Amino acid sequence: MDCSPDIVDLVATEPCFAPHFHLPLQHASNAVLTAMRRPYTIEYFRALTLSIRSRMPHASIGSDVIVGFPGESDDDFACLAGYLESSPLSHIHVFPYSDRPGTAASTMNGKVPGAVVRERARTIRDIGQQLLERFREGQRGTVHRALTLDDGSLAVTGNYLKVRIPPGRA
């Protein structure tokens, strides 16, 4: 993971940086992370995201998650869902695992049936929607700098929220 405490400190203290982080969780089960050959643990990821949230309460923290990786058990999936529900993440991108020719994962045993992968992806997307709604609600009433888009009726804040701007207010 290429986000160090020094980077968190820099973003927290320098106003030229947008308070938006995108960190590749991939999974919350250490067994699955090991199978994916990820060089970090869920404990490291949790500590990093909690550090960001404590330093920058309004920061956006997004992540990518893969469901259905070969060998992902029901317990592994429950670990992922449970972590996400209580995580400080503001949004997630969910990817159902699919074989890619020539990759180590494509030759692994323990393939998860497609219907199960699709159901797990739906469940995690639902959790992701709840995370986004919680983050948006936490931003209600706050003021942020934003970059207007197109005709000025839409904008993106530094913490990655898309907002509508009333006519004449841009």
Q: What is each residue range found by the language model?
A:
Residues 1-91, 102-116:
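Conserved non-cysteine loop/helix-boundary elements of the Radical SAM core domain that shape
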Residues 19-21, 59, 90-93, 142-144, ...:
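Structural beta-strand/beta-sheet cores of well-ordered domains, especially the beta-sheet scaffolds
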Residues 24-26, 62-64, 95-97, 149, ...:
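Generic beta-strand/beta-sheet core signal
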Residues 96-101, 136-137:
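AMP-binding (ANL) adenylation modules
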Residues 107-170:
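Terminal RNA-binding accessory module
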